[in-house]
């Protein structure tokens, strides 16, 4: 009997593998690089309109405005204490480059536009004077703010009235699992980092000096970013699912992958709309702040050293984080409310 024991184990393993494969095909019937006819992948997804859903998220936050404003203010204070406030000179440089790029765009000088965008991303991603330890702590606090927002909204949707301290004390249990998913998202963004490196290298040798070359590279960059966002759709929803009690990272990725099957593009449109609203809010608020800052400092030179714009940027960062967390969580609730199975 011992001679046949390895064969029995092999047959059991083969049967279990076949069952897992059949279950996987039932959950996700569509294969990559194989054509699926439209009639075979129709999966319902009933969502409100873009403006209607944005208003829904706004009202959900406004009903508990004291709690969420306090949460955003807390993150802004932590960012300021850790020194994650970009210098006033950097924002002034960005402002000047943006003004120059607006005029240059009409003349086909796309390099000025990309330089302004790259400078803004660099200024927000790695503020001057922030140590690596402080950056890690900022990421950890940012994940905690994400989890706290999800926890508070989940409690509010259940009919309870939680306080901010309840969320801060209770939402941190899946912090390590959330950090694992954040690392997965960072890996998925590696192609974007490679595009930025390619842009820096090609610009240094002068290959992107002409308008046509810059335009082609810009189209390539937009394509890469779109594919990355399409790829990250499941990961973004997994960052919400991981907040459920007893959830593990791989299981959250599995559930999120099942949720977005047949709906990925429509969910991606909603995420792009979220990004558009945040960008417009940043342009509006920081534009008004820079104008007001310049006017006040011309009237009262004594306040010329007051970093008004950097602190407003810290506030906008915290508000954007809370808004994004709420938007994605409520979007997730709308998606799972339509429990249609994959076609």
Where are these regions (language model features)?
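Hydrophobic transmembrane alpha-helix segments characteristic of membrane transport
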Residues: 144-173
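Hydrophobic alpha-helical transmembrane segments of multi-pass membrane transport/permease proteins
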Residues: 67-96, 140, 144, 184-196, ...
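Juxtamembrane transition segments at transmembrane-helix termini in multipass membrane proteins
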Residues: 2-50, 56, 77-78, 93-125, ...
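Membrane-interfacial helix-loop-helix connectors in multipass membrane proteins
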Residues: 198-220, 290-308
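Transmembrane alpha-helical segments in integral membrane proteins
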Residues: 131-155, 234, 319-335
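Cytosolic juxtamembrane amphipathic/interface segments immediately preceding
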Residues: 51-64, 165
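Membrane-interface helix starts
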Residues: 58-74, 175-180, 261-272
């Amino acid at each position: 009997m011992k001679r046949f024991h390895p064969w029995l184990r092999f047959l059991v393993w083969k049967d279990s593998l076949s069952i897992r494969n059949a279950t996987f095909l039932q959950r996700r019937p569509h294969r990559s690089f194989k054509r699926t006819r439209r009639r075979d992948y129709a999966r319902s997804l009933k969502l409100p309109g873009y403006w209607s859903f944005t208003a829904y998220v706004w009202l959900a936050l406004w009903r508990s405005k004291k709690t969420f404003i306090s949460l955003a203010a807390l993150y802004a204070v932590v960012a300021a204490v850790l020194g994650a406030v970009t210098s006033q000179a950097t924002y002034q440089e960005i402002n000047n480059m943006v003004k120059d790029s607006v005029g240059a765009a009409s003349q086909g000088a796309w390099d000025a536009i990309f330089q302004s965008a790259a400078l803004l991303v660099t200024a927000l991603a790695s503020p001057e004077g922030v140590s690596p330890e402080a950056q890690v702590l900022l990421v950890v606090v940012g994940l905690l703010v994400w989890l706290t927002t999800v926890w508070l909204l989940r409690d509010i949707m259940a009919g309870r009235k939680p306080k901010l301290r309840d969320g801060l004390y209770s939402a941190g249990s899946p912090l390590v699992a959330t950090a694992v998913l954040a690392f997965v998202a960072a890996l998925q963004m590696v192609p974007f980092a490679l595009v930025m490196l390619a842009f820096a290298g090609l610009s240094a040798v002068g290959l992107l000096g002409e308008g046509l070359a810059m335009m082609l590279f810009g189209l390539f960059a937009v394509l890469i970013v779109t594919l990355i966002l399409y790829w990250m759709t499941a990961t973004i929803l997994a960052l919400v699912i991981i907040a459920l009690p007893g959830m593990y990272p791989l299981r959250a990725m599995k559930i999120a992958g099942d949720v977005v099957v047949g709906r990925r593009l429509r969910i991606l449109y909603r995420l792009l709309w979220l990004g558009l609203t945040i960008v417009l809010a940043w342009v509006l608020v920081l534009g008004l702040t820079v104008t007001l800052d310049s006017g006040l400092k011309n009237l009262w030179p004594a306040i010329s050293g007051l970093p008004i714009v950097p602190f407003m940027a810290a506030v906008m960062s915290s508000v954007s984080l809370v808004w994004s967390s709420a938007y994605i969580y409520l979007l997730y609730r709308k998606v799972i409310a339509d429990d249609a199975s994959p076609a």
